[in-house]
């Protein structure tokens, strides 16, 4: 399909939306929640609307969601859920639009992640306020804080393995496994937009501790699985494991909150998130370690 964009005739290639080439893709449950976005991207493609503007719009939807949760208006949970889903949907339009246009950037990458962080903090505070206000039990602040920390750690867990995989496949180059500021980043900032570096520093401040914790957990698991350094690529290229942990992504977390908000079961959502979803993720890690050790033992026996 041919469009006129900025005075030039350009073709729309839906395949460019994907983060991974066909042969490297795996089943990602998150794609079920926003499958309609390809049509929205197609509509936006020839317009002057930018991916970063979509990110800002997703921020507005997220702020509206948090506001509705604590507003006390009739059907507050329903409206909170509606705007939260709008945030989720738009959050997956901006990146796809950037990839289709070939305008991905480090600025957009950090803006998107920092928007996710801010909205997540506010929404979880709002949900906790609702529980405390409706029950009169301040103990729910502990449950809300545990839910927030769990949400961040599960999402970082998924992203850690996803970026390790995509970096080896050779796609999704705007993300790095370690986003710590390097000498190269400082040098690049001198001749480019300084906001790239500013957002990167802020990103490291809010996400760095999560990345370090997941990195240490992964190192422990590799030791338990007896993975030598020269076989790390195989460890991070397990598509079945990536498919299995995809429900831990922030997107699915938000969809769960949307569903339980519509059901009026915010407490149950937090309990399931903290208990079941953590056990689910740890169970998959245990399975990965056990499978790896079993396969290595088979190879030893064959020799």
Where do the language-model regions lie?
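Alpha-helical transmembrane segments
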Residues: 128, 133-134, 138-165
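Transmembrane helix interruption/hinge and helix-loop junction motifs
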Residues: 70-77, 135-138, 262-271
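C-terminal membrane-associated helical module and adjoining short loops/tails
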Residues: 2-36, 163-303
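Membrane-embedded alpha-helical segments that form the functional core of polytopic membrane enzymes
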Residues: 51-107, 124, 141-150
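Juxtamembrane helix-capping/reentrant segments at transmembrane boundaries
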Residues: 98, 102-115, 176-177, 301-303
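Alpha-helical transmembrane segments of multipass membrane proteins
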Residues: 43, 63-67, 257-259
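Select subsegments of transmembrane alpha-helices in polytopic membrane proteins
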Residues: 51-56, 112-120, 241-251
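Structural signal for membrane-spanning alpha-helices in multi-pass inner-membrane proteins
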Residues: 66-70, 123, 127, 261, ...
């Amino acid at each position: 399909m041919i469009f006129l964009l900025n005075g030039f005739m350009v073709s729309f290639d839906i395949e460019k939306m994907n983060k991974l080439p066909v042969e490297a893709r795996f089943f990602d449950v998150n794609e079920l929640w926003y499958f309609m976005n390809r049509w929205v991207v197609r509509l936006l493609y020839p317009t002057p609307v930018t991916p970063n503007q979509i990110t800002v719009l997703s921020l507005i939807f997220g702020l509206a969601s948090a506001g509705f949760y604590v507003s006390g208006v009739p059907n507050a949970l329903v409206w909170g859920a509606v705007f939260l889903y709008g945030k989720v949907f738009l959050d997956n339009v901006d990146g796809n639009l950037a990839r289709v246009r070939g305008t991905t950037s480090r600025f957009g990458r950090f803006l998107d992640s920092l928007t996710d962080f801010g909205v997540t903090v506010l929404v979880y505070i709002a949900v906790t306020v609702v529980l405390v206000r409706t029950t009169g039990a301040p103990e729910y602040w502990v449950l809300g804080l545990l839910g927030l920390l769990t949400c961040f750690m599960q999402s970082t867990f998924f992203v850690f393995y996803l970026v390790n995989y995509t970096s080896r496949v050779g796609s999704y180059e705007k993300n790095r496994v370690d986003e710590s500021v390097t000498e190269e980043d400082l040098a690049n900032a001198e001749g480019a937009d300084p906001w790239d570096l500013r957002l990167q520093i802020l990103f490291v401040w809010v996400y760095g501790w999560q990345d370090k914790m997941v990195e240490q957990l992964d190192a422990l698991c590799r030791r338990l699985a007896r993975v030598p350094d020269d076989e790390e690529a195989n460890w991070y290229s397990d598509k079945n494991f990536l498919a299995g942990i995809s429900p831990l992504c922030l997107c699915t977390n938000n969809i769960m909150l949307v569903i339980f908000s519509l059901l009026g079961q915010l407490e149950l959502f937090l309990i399931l998130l903290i208990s079941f979803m953590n056990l689910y993720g740890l169970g998959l890690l245990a399975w990965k370690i056990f499978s790896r050790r079993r396969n290595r033992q088979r190879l030893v026996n064959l020799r």
